[in-house]
A protein has these predicted regions:
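C-terminal interaction appendages of subunits in large macromolecular complexes
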Residues: 2-16, 23-31, 191-193, 197-391
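Catalytic phosphate-handling regions of large nucleic-acid enzymes and associated NTPases
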Residues: 2-253, 315-317
Length: 391
């Protein structure tokens, strides 16, 4: 920044009087398409490829860097370590800061209940995915190790099954993909927002996914819906099953699924207890919406609502006024509040660095091809290792 002179002249003294500014005062005319191509597209593709969208192994780069760091730390078989230790080591692969790394760890943990099959075995307060107010503790207070399911993520990774690339400062290497032995891309929910596109892959039952994959390998024309009935969300609740909608999602990778909360009616207390809510919402969003409806006069049957969630699990208690039919009230709440919510599916996955929206059959086809390549590379590695050396 230019400094003011101290000689009292009031003139601004330049730090670099001989500096030359290229095109100073000149307006450069350029087609907007060319400008976008040079400036916007590299940024957009960087977000799409390097951050937001999952790949065929079911992971984004941030997930992969964290889990691989934990694997290298021996946390697949060893005892838990402080989360802060893992975060610090992960920064060798991920330079985006400790807060971003720890937040990724929280979402992958068992304690947060975001995933159907968590990858991180956690100890301590990791918050809850269904509550905005239940914040997770700092990394120095929590402990983690890899969940046993991660054995299937790293199996034979040391046998040249996948490619490795240098990290950001060329001090070490990291895998471009994990040689997963089951279609993780379909087992756990994966959401991401990129530039001009997004991804939202719903989770499915692990046993059904494996059964469907085996059937597909034996017969590529296998009827997918006969073995994979529909999504399976963590946290419970009900899915309003629409077979035609499910078939459309399976075929195109796009669609919407209706999820409904589970509740009990305590007759003695004249109280409705919500014990499970849709995966796509939170306790606070539900309570705020109900209170808003009460203020507007659209809901008059409720005398009090409170959050009774504790270590035993989720619970929203709704006290009813005398003479209110709980079933009729719940039907009204399902229509007006997130107690019934939609989960939008958009199976947008990176294949060879290119985003593609695919149906279940296409995803299975891509995963099987990927897995076949991993097996071939492992076999070649073993053959070369056991090959007798020529004397």
């Amino acid at each position: 920044m230019p400094k003011k002179s101290k000689d009292g002249s009031g003139k601004i003294k330049r730090n670099y009087p001989d500096a030359f500014i290229e095109n100073a005062g000149i307006v450069v005319q350029e087609k907007i398409t060319d400008t976008l191509e040079k400036n916007y597209m590299p940024y957009a593709m960087s977000v799409i490829v390097s951050r937001a969208l999952p790949e065929i192994d079911g992971f984004k780069p941030s997930h992969r860097k964290l889990l691989y760091t934990m694997y290298k730390q021996g946390l697949l078989t060893g005892k838990r370590t402080k989360s802060a230790n893992v975060v610090g080591e992960t920064m060798k692969l991920n330079p985006h800061g400790d807060d971003a790394i720890y937040e990724t760890m929280v979402r992958l943990s068992r304690g947060n209940e975001t995933l159907l099959h968590p990858y991180v075995d956690s100890k301590g307060n990791f918050g809850k995915s269904y509550s905005r107010d239940m914040a997770y503790a700092a990394s120095r207070y929590t402990e983690v190790k890899l969940d046993p399911i991660c054995n299937e993520l790293f199996r034979d990774i040391d046998k040249d099954t996948v490619d490795f690339v240098p990290n950001y400062d060329n001090s070490t290497t990291e895998p471009t993909l994990f040689p997963t032995t089951f279609p993780t891309i379909l087992v756990n929910a994966n959401m991401g927002i990129a530039v001009s596109m997004a991804s939202s892959v719903c989770p499915f039952n692990l046993a059904e996914v494996c059964e469907t994959c085996i059937a597909y390998i034996k017969n590529p024309d296998h009827d997918i819906i006969s073995t994979l009935k529909g999504p399976d969300f963590p946290g419970g609740g009900f899915m309003l099953y629409d077979e035609e909608e499910i078939k459309e999602i399976f075929r195109t990778g796009r669609g919407s699924i209706k999820l409904r909360s589970k509740y009990n009616y305590d007759k003695s207390a004249n109280c409705i207890e919500i014990t499970q809510i849709p995966y796509s919402t939170t306790i606070e969003a539900i309570i705020e919406k109900i209170i808003d409806l009460i203020k507007q006069g659209k809901i008059k049957e409720i005398s009090y609502i409170r959050d009774e969630t504790d270590l035993n699990g989720l619970k929203i208690a709704i006290d009813l006024k005398r003479g209110v039919d709980p079933e009729k009230l719940m039907n009204k709440l399902f229509k007006l509040t997130p107690l019934q919510d939609n989960y939008s599916c958009n199976f947008n996955i990176l294949i060879g660095g290119v985003p593609r929206v695919m149906g279940i059959r296409e995803i299975l086809g891509e995963w099987v091809a990927f897995r076949e390549e991993c097996v071939k590379r492992r076999v070649y590695f073993d053959l070369n290792k056991n090959k007798p050396s020529s004397s």
